[in-house]
């Protein structure tokens, strides 16, 4: 979320009560002085560096003005999907791996209160996109929402702008220890779990949630797995298709975590990650592995938004 939008939201929302939110008020003062997304952050870890960065292009569609989520298609190797931050219409933007504009889909029945993450996955032979409406700067939202839509199919004629995508199911949920801000969400399809990494705590916390709700009327609960103290303000997360690697984006860096076979993610995130080699972007909040899991794409909330590809294996330049 860029500073102007952040400040506007702070001004437009009803102020919390002074007694209950004293600490939050102090955080807000720091944010006002230093800029949204940079307050109370300590230095990120300095682990071994991996990857070869390439500027793949710029996001061509001018309507993608605040890219808060990025996900690789699970149908087409040359396609990425992107979303805008809160305040935009409920739209999915199709983007080439060179940043080319490939069209737009409207998500019928969804609202973009504060869309902050996008994930792609396959489940029971079908490709899906998960849109995470989980942003909560004030940590006041009693419930937040995940929208799951079938990934749109692109014909030879391409995408007609304005076509609709339908919601397959949605998950309304809360966190077991109360409201919090989150921008990093990923899907572990093999385990049928959604992973969520909190943002504004001094030590981010990893949570998990069932991918399928018990029913549409039940408010689910995301359960705490572990604190991840060596990361600062995570802004994005993704898993490889095989579920053996995770990438986490922060305002300063990107980090690669390798999971061992049959290991819980709580143990994976306790180990020291590898740091991705690329120059930090302004307000970087969107990250995705490529189709084959051999590279990572990163973009930012700005215009023009550069699309950076970090190749993880020298011998495999596939996206």
Please tell me what each predicted stretch does.
Residues 37-319:
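Sequence/structural signature of beta-propeller domains
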Residues 11-24:
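Bacterial N-terminal signal peptides that target proteins for export
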Residues 2-3, 20-21, 70:
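Positively charged n-region of N-terminal signal peptides that target proteins for export
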């Amino acid at each position: 979320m860029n500073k102007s939008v952040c400040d506007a939201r702070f001004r437009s929302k009803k102020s919390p009560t002074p007694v209950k939110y004293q600490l939050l008020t102090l955080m807000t003062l720091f944010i006002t002085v230093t800029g949204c997304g940079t307050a109370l952050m300590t230095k990120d870890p300095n682990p071994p560096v991996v990857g070869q960065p390439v500027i793949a292009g710029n996001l061509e569609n001018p309507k993608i003005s605040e890219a808060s989520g990025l996900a690789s298609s699970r149908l087409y190797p040359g396609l990425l999907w992107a979303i805008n931050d809160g305040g935009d219409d409920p739209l999915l933007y199709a983007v080439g791996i060179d940043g080319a504009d490939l069209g737009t889909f409207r998500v019928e029945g969804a609202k973009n209160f504060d869309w902050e993450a996008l994930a792609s996955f396959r489940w029971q032979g079908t490709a899906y996109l998960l849109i995470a409406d989980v942003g909560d700067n004030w940590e006041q939202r009693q419930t937040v929402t995940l929208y799951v839509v079938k990934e749109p199919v692109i014909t030879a004629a391409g995408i007609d702008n304005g076509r609709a995508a339908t919601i397959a199911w949605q998950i309304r949920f809360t966190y077991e220890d109360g409201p919090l801000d989150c921008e990093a969400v990923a899907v572990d399809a093999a385990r049928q779990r959604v992973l969520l990494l909190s943002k504004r705590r001094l030590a981010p916390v990893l949570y998990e949630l069932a991918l399928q709700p018990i029913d549409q009327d039940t408010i689910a609960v995301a359960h705490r797995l572990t604190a991840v103290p060596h990361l600062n303000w995570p802004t994005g997360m993704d898993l490889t298709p095989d579920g053996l690697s995770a990438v986490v984006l922060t305002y300063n860096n990107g980090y690669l975590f390798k999971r061992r076979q049959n290991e819980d993610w709580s143990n994976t995130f306790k180990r020291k990650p590898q740091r991705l080699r690329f120059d930090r972007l302004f307000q970087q909040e969107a990250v995705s592995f490529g189709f084959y899991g051999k590279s990572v794409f990163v973009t930012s909330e700005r215009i023009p938004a550069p699309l950076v590809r970090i190749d993880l294996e020298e011998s495999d330049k596939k996206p």
